[in-house]
């Protein structure tokens, strides 16, 4: 629904919650009864398509959540998930399971998109975030496999090659998260 006019040439079209509810209802109505994923990229922090300026609640970044407990992360994601569900969204491109290997990373570290530099902390908070979304009826999508936390460039602005910076420890959160019961 919302695009940056500099990137896609489309105006921003989210005005408020009621308008988003009408848009998602219209999408479902046009689906001829077929199941439909209505997805958003709502991580919290700086990556939020539903923004406070449009009347939506602000949510902390992964870096902020990572300084707390996994249970607090789950509760935050549950609240976010309930808000998304009310809007008619059922899939969220979150949480980020990137390990903050390179804090100066323009796409991860600088934006506070990683829970931690410790793979076990990332796994614990990522699982808690997914559980909170799932408890609200939202499908969680883990990203950015195989790991974007060591990237020296922003993949939103071009090809990012991590072959020289990537390490095996960046897989750990994915192994933990995907190895849990009920995860695919």
Positions of predicted regions on the chain:
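Short, well-ordered coil/turn segments that N-cap beta-strands
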Residues: 32-36, 89-90, 134-139, 179-184
